[in-house]
Structure formats: structure tokens, C-alpha cells
């Protein structure tokens, strides 16, 4: 009965909200917003001088004659009709409006562009075709977000050549660490049935600068390399190519092996291999030929195939070490098969063999840093931002700055595996900025930030890129939680330019997603910006380490983790990773080693990662660690309570469907956060 009444109440609230909009509220809706349009939520702009200026420019358009003209035209028509309520006229040459043309500035590269404006026209120039695609989306964003269009003088060149989204999608549609429904690709229907959603997905990625997509899970089902699946992959590649996006695959390293000869650990798909060999030894000539033939087959179907992303000798996945070979042997074998076609290998460094070191945080560095300079020129090491496993807070991976002769691509996690799934509103951009991109490694002295390293400013690199593990699924609004889209958007903007300001990225997402006025924008910004810090305080205080259950990475799991992965007693808490402990601090350059090694100098954000600290220790706040720890556990509840109030305060500024869905998400977050707090309180009370 209570359940029925609650459902009725929600439906009634939705109905009344809709009616209030139809009969005189501040915003009139012609369509129902579901969130499907993401940040390309083109709605009529309010009447203003800025709108009239945009109408003057947007009335006539000259296309450049690029291979992307068709999608550029479609996007401009869609955007300008909706935003300005005008239908642009496309002409061969014009002295007014928007004029696109090729220029001779080779410095713009394959994807750069220049946007300039005078009184009568806006010029968009590029050296190569893709520059017009990205420049078009930038121009639309300027109009959509209400930027002045007069006196524009913008020059954009992506800082990173490879801007990648990793989809951990299985062939059965499941998404590992996915919380927005099944995976996007309907494998069973491909290649015959092409869903419109695939094109909309490509539009979304191109609009934020993404140019590479890994289609399948790194815990790879070997069947992805079968000819039938390669034809499905080719069908997706044909769609994505229109938006300057290359496809990549994650192969199973043991794919050449006969299914009947594989280890038990790999038999969840009926055996690891799909081949005819008795070995996957990378130095075996037959294995090398198998991969060469397979790569040739792939390129016969997908001429612009990007390459392979490989998870090897990690969490049960096969790899070269199964045959007493090195990561170098495995990566280079695949790289040589791909090189004639221009493909690359992204070899993941997420390994934590306990035989390497007792401290898990030291293992990746110890396994890969000695291999610097031994990988072939088309090999990249794809490396998580931190040393543990996408924790709410952890120090930056010390491999960044320690491998001068091997390209490293950061792997960030957009999906919220340890940060509240699709339940919690947690904005990840501040985390990526503070704990990773702005971290100064001191590998070349002061100013050697991770951002400067990955963009080639600190020292040169053969390839520059960044990968993000996607949070996208078949949920109607793509990410389940409407605010999770902000993390997808922010990743794309960061991958284009890691120095882009947090304020600019955040404001643009709010404006283009919620179509709101400045006052509403400020309320939404107030909701978003503190969420990461509050989540850390409540769920992973002072970078303590894993605090959630191994089974779900969501519910409180202090009993599972305590005194196994971090230490706690009535006297103290935290793990000693100083020179007197596990000596993890020595993987950092001297400046950071000394800071992390000192209890008084160590940033409090990382205090319990590096030190076992007495509960009585005096914090910067003046409180004891015990007092501040206990107080901070409430921060999650306090934040969601504030956000519920803020969200309710702008109800009449938000469309009713998305308003109600976000409100219900906040209520769910409130319930789960209270449960987590109570579990934490119950556990730690025995030590206070």
C-alpha cells in the first residue's frame, strides 16, 4: 500500500509540475527534456542583443569543402534552428555570415582551427578537414552559452593527439563498473541493424573533442577478434568515421590459443583462445604470424583502425609473463603487427602481483619503470592516475615523470566505481585537477606538473594522449544520473586542453545542459563544486584506502579492509609508507618524497595513505585526528542535505521530468549516505 501511494504521489507531482509549466511558469517547454540531448540541448535563446548578433552571423554559411561538410551542415542546421529560430542558408561564397575555408597555417595540424569575427562575418579556418568539425562545435557552444560573438580571435590546437574513451562493455551487453544500463552496442543486431543512437553518441563525443573509442572491455572476450565480430566493429567504425573517431579493440592476449588448452582462469567464455595454437608465447614465430594475419584481417575491414588496448597479467588475464616473457616482449610483438598499418598498442600498467612487493601501491612502478626505453615507438603505457585503483583520493602515480623514454597516457575513470556509482552527485573535475593534473612531480624541478608532462612540455614524447573509462550506457539519458554527464563532458574538455579552467568547463556544461539563467547556473555550480571533497571526507578520509566491500565497491566494507589493506587500532590509524615503513615515498622525486615522508608536512588529504597517525595527533584545524575524523564522516550527509535544498530552490527553473529524476537521485543518495555513515560510526567507535 505504501509503495503504491508513493508511486501515485510521484506521478501526481510530475503531472502538477507539467501543468504549472503549461499555465504560466517562467519557462515554457515545447518538448519534454529527458537528458538524451546531453549538452547539445539546443533550446531557443532569450531575446537579447547577443541573440540578434548570432542571427546576423548565422543566417548565411559557406562550407569549406571538407570531408565532414555533411555532418557540419546537419549540426549547424539543427543548432541554429533551435537556438536562433532561423534556418541558415548555405551559399558558395559570402561577405556576411559564417565563412569556412582552408588556410596554409600548418601549425594548426590535423585538428586545430581559428575563429575570428568582424562586424559582418565570422571566419572559421583550418589546415585540415577535422579542424572544421571541431571548430563548428566550438562556434555552436559560443552561441549556445551566450558568449559575445564580436571581435572573436580564437586559435585552438588540441594539446593531446589521442583523446580516448574506454568502454568496458562485454559481448553480452554487460558493462563492467557500468551503472547506466547495458552497453551501447547491440552486438547481436550488428552489422545489419544500425541504431540512430550510435550516430548521436558519435556527435556527443566529437562535440567535446573525443577522437578515439575502445569498444570492448579490457577483461577481453577473445571472440571480439572473430571475423563475425570484426564485421560488427566495422559497421560502428563506418559511423564514427564521419565524426573523426577511430575505433580500437581490447584483445585477449591468449587469443591465438586453442580453447581446449587454456587455463581454468580464462574459461568464462569457454576458453581464452579462438585460435589453433598451443601457445601464446610472444616470441614464438607462429604466434607472431597469427597476430600479423589477424591485424591484416582487421585492416582489410577497417582501414583506419586505431590499434589495441591490452590488459595483460593482471587480475587473471593472460599475458607474456605466463611464458616467462616480459611486458616489453608482449607489447612489442603486437606493436610490430600493427606498425605497417599505422596502429598503436596501449599497454595497461594496472598490475599488482603480490610477489613484486608487499605494498600494492609500489607494484606498478617497480614492474614498469625499469622497462623505460625498451618499448617500440608505437607502444604507449596506459596508466591510472593513482597507484591504488581509482580511489576517491590517492596520490598521483609516480610513473608520471619517471619514464622519459616511454609515452604514458593517463587513464581516468569517468564512471564512478568508488565514488557513488550513478547514485551520488560527485563532480570529478576538481579531483582530476587537484590530485593529478596539477600535481608537481619535480622530475625537472618546480613546474613539472603531470599536466605539463602529458602535454610534452616537461620533456618530449612520441605520442600524447589521455583515456577515460566511460560512464555511458543504454539509459535513456546515457548516464542514469543527470549530473554524471558533467564528468563525461569535463573529461572531453580536459583531454582537448588539460589547462582549461574548471570554471569555464563547469559553466559551459551547466548552460548547455540546463538552458538556465545566471542565478540558476550559480545554484547548480554550488551543488556541484563541493561534492568531491565531501565524498572523500565521508567515504575515504585522508586517503585511507579501500573502505567499500569487495563485492560491490559501494556499500561500507570497513571490516573487510581493516588491518588487511590499512591499519587501525585504539592508538592510531593509517599505513606507514615512509622510509621507515614500506618506503613507497621513495618512488617520488626528492621534493615530494621529503614532504610525504614528514608527518607534519604531508598534505592532510594524503595523511593516512603515508602515515600511521595517533588518534590524538593535532590537525591544522586545531582538532585532534579523532575529533576531525568523526566530524568529517558527516560531511556526506550534510552535502546531500544542502544539495536537496538548493535543487528545490530552483524547481521553477528546471523542466519537470529532469527535476523530479534528479530529486529522486538525491533522495537515494541521502538514504545510502546515511547508511554508510552509520556503518562507519559503528566500526570506528570501537577504536575511539
Where are these regions (language model features)?
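Bacterial Sec-dependent N-terminal signal peptides
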Residues: 1-28
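Acidic, contiguous N-terminal accessory segments
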Residues: 24-122, 127, 149-153
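Conserved short loop/turn motifs at secondary-structure junctions
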Residues: 25, 219-226, 314-316, 352-354
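Acidic/histidine-rich, surface-exposed loop or edge segments in extracytoplasmic proteins
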Residues: 50-67, 182-186, 216-219, 611-629, ...
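Feature activates predominantly on carbohydrate-active enzymes
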Residues: 63-75, 79, 105-290, 294-307, ...
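Acidic carboxylate-rich catalytic motifs and surrounding loops in phosphoryl-/glycosyl-chemistry enzymes
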Residues: 90-93, 347-353, 522
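Catalytic-core regions of glycoside hydrolase
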Residues: 189, 261, 275-507, 513
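Catalytic domains of carbohydrate-active enzymes that cleave complex glycans
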Residues: 447-688
Amino acid at each position: 500500500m505504501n509503495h503504491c501511494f508513493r508511486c501515485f504521489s510521484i506521478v501526481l507531482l510530475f503531472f502538477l509540475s507539467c501543468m504549472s509549466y503549461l499555465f504560466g511558469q517562467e519557462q515554457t517547454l515545447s518538448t519534454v527534456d529527458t537528458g538524451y540531448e546531453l549538452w547539445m540541448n539546443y533550446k531557443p535563446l532569450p531575446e537579447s542583443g547577443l541573440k540578434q548578433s548570432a542571427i546576423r552571423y548565422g543566417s548565411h554559411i559557406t562550407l569549406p569543402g571538407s570531408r565532414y561538410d555533411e555532418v557540419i551542415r546537419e549540426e549547424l542546421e539543427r543548432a541554429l534552428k533551435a537556438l536562433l529560430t532561423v534556418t541558415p542558408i548555405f551559399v558558395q561564397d559570402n561577405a556576411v555570415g559564417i565563412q569556412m575555408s582552408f588556410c596554409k597555417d600548418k601549425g594548426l595540424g590535423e585538428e586545430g582551427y581559428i575563429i575570428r569575427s568582424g562586424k559582418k562575418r565570422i571566419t572559421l579556418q583550418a589546415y585540415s578537414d577535422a579542424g572544421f568539425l571541431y571548430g563548428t562545435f566550438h562556434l555552436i557552444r559560443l552561441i549556445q552559452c551566450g558568449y559575445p560573438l564580436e571581435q572573436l580571435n580564437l586559435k585552438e590546437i588540441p594539446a593531446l593527439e589521442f583523446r580516448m574513451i574506454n568502454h568496458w562493455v562485454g559481448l553480452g551487453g554487460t558493462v563492467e563498473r557500468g551503472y547506466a544500463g547495458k552497453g551501447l552496442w547491440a552486438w547481436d543486431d550488428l552489422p545489419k541493424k544500425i541504431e540512430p543512437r550510435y550516430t548521436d553518441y558519435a556527435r556527443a563525443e566529437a562535440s567535446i573533442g573525443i577522437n578515439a573509442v575502445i569498444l570492448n572491455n579490457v577483461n577481453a572476450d577473445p571472440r571480439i577478434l572473430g571475423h563475425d565480430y570484426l564485421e560488427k566493429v566495422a559497421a560502428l567504425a563506418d559511423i564514427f568515421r564521419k565524426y573523426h573517431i577511430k575505433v580500437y579493440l581490447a584483445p585477449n592476449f591468449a587469443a591465438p590459443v586453442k580453447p581446449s588448452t587454456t587455463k581454468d582462469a580464462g574459461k568464462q567464455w569457454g576458453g581464452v583462445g579462438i585460435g589453433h595454437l598451443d601457445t601464446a608465447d610472444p616470441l614464438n614465430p607462429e604466434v607472431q604470424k597469427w597476430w600479423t594475419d589477424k591485424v591484416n584481417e582487421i585492416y582489410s575491414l577497417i582501414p583506419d583502425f586505431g590499434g589495441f588496448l591490452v590488459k595483460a597479467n593482471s587480475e587473471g588475464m593472460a599475458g607474456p609473463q605466463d611464458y616467462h616473457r616480459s611486458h616489453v616482449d608482449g607489447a612489442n610483438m603486437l606493436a610490430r603487427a600493427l606498425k605497417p598499418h599505422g596502429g598503436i598498442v596501449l599497454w595497461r600498467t594496472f598490475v599488482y602481483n603480490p610477489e613484486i612487493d608487499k605494498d600494492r601501491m609500489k607494484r606498478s612502478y617497480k614492474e614498469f619503470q625499469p622497462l623505460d626505453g625498451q618499448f617500440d615507438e608505437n607502444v604507449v603505457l596506459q596508466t591510472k592516475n593513482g597507484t591504488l585503483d581509482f580511489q576517491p583520493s590517492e596520490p598521483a602515480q609516480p610513473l608520471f615523470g619517471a619514464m622519459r623514454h616511454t609515452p604514458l597516457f593517463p587513464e581516468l575513470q569517468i564512471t564512478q566505481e568508488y565514488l557513488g556509482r550513478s547514485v551520488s552527485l560527485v563532480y570529478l573535475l576538481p579531483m582530476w585537477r587537484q590530485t593529478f593534473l596539477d600535481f608537481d612531480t619535480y622530475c625537472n624541478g618546480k613546474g613539472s606538473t603531470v599536466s605539463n608532462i602529458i602535454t610534452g612540455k616537461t620533456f618530449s614524447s612520441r605520442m600524447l594522449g589521455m583515456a577515460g573509462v566511460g560512464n555511458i550506457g543504454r539509459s535513456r539519458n546515457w548516464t542514469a544520473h543527470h549530473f554524471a554527464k558533467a564528468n563525461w563532458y569535463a573529461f572531453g574538455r580536459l583531454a582537448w586542453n588539460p589547462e582549461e579552467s574548471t570554471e569555464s568547463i563547469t559553466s559551459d556544461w551547466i548552460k548547455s545542459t540546463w538552458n538556465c539563467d545566471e542565478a540558476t547556473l550559480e545554484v547548480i555550480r554550488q551543488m556541484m563544486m563541493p561534492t568531491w571533497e565531501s565524498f572523500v571526507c565521508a567515504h575515504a578520509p585522508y586517503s585511507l584506502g579501500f573502505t567499500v566491500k569487495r563485492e560491490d565497491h559501494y556499500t561500507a566494507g570497513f571490516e573487510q579492509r581493516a588491518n588487511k589493506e590499512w591499519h587501525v587500532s585504539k592508538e592510531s590509524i593509517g599505513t606507514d609508507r615512509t622510509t621507515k615503513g614500506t618506503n613507497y615515498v621513495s618512488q617520488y622525486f626528492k621534493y615530494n618524497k621529503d614532504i610525504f615522508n614528514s608527518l607534519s608536512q604531508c598534505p592532510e588529504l594524503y595523511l593516512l595513505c603515508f602515515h600511521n597517525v595517533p588518534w590524538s595527533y593535532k590537525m591544522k584545524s586545531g582538532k585532534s585526528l579523532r575529533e576531525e575524523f568523526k566530524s568529517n564522516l558527516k560531511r556526506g550527509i550534510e552535502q546531500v542535505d544542502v544539495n536537496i535544498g538548493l535543487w528545490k530552490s530552483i524547481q521553477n527553473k528546471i523542466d519537470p521530468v529532469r527535476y523530479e529524476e534528479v530529486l529522486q537521485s538525491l533522495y537515494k543518495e541521502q538514504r545510502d549516505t546515511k547508511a554508510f555513515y552509520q556503518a562507519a560510526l559503528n566500526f570506528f567507535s570501537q577504536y575511539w
